[in-house]
Amino acid sequence: MGLLTFRDVAIEFSREEWEHLDSDQKLLYGDVMLENYGNLVSLGLAVSKPDLITFLEQRKEPWNVKSAETVAIQPDIFSHDTQGLLRKKLIEASFQKVILDGYGSCGPQNLNLRKEWESEGKIILW
């Protein structure tokens, strides 16, 4: 079993399937794909940006993207220390998501929380 790639977590729609989605479903799809890619990047598993991510960042329709392929780096030595670091990053990203899901849409009173996270170099995933 190799390393996880973006292709492993990406969902692809045909143009016809995409046309059946309403605007909220399309936005949710974009948010989920961007979050999945962000998680792979934070774990050091993505080294190139897939075309799909570029399209989603530009809010373009993704159905004409050729490939969701992302090349993963295969470490020469996958040490116990490296495994621990990856596990820690995944836990931090998951914790951040839980915090933001709970407080991210509550309005201006949480702007300070967001600024604090950004100032500490934490990645904000919406």
Curated annotation (Swiss-Prot):
Gene3D superfamilies: 6.10.140.140. It comes from the Eukaryota. CDD domains: KRAB_A-box (cd07765). PROSITE patterns: KRAB. SMART domains: KRAB. Residues 4-75 form the KRAB domain. Disulfide bonds: none annotated. Signal peptide: none annotated. GO terms for biological process: regulation of DNA-templated transcription. Pfam families: KRAB (PF01352). This is KRAB domain-containing protein 5.
